Amino acid sequence: MSHAPKRLLAKRMRRTPTVQEAQLWHALRDRKLGGFKFRRQTPIGRYVADFVCLERRLIVEADGPFHFDDGERDAWLRANGYRVLRFTNQEIEAGLDNVLAAILAAAAPKRALSP
């Protein structure tokens, strides 16, 4: 299966982000959040992730009303080793700091508990 159609779709989506995607990208790009490298509109399998940190296998989705309940997509991504965080556009607009804190907490390496 060719990945060319997904790459073209991802490229088009990078050119026309929503306001909320642009706000989130501004906060994630250039390793601004905890030093983690995020990519935007990245093809993963048959899907295009809004944002992904490949190092932590973490996907962040900024969702409007039509994408928030996408269980099949999330199940496929999780089955392939990714964690998926979803935020509504309203959550991003009203509380970007809270969204970034949740992303940072999910991206941070898990520490073993001391005995």
Where are the regions a protein language model picked out?
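Basic, amphipathic alpha-helical patches used to engage nucleic acids or provide basic targeting signals
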Residues: 13-18, 42-106
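Solvent-exposed, charged helical/coil patches
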Residues: 1-36, 79, 91-94, 107-115
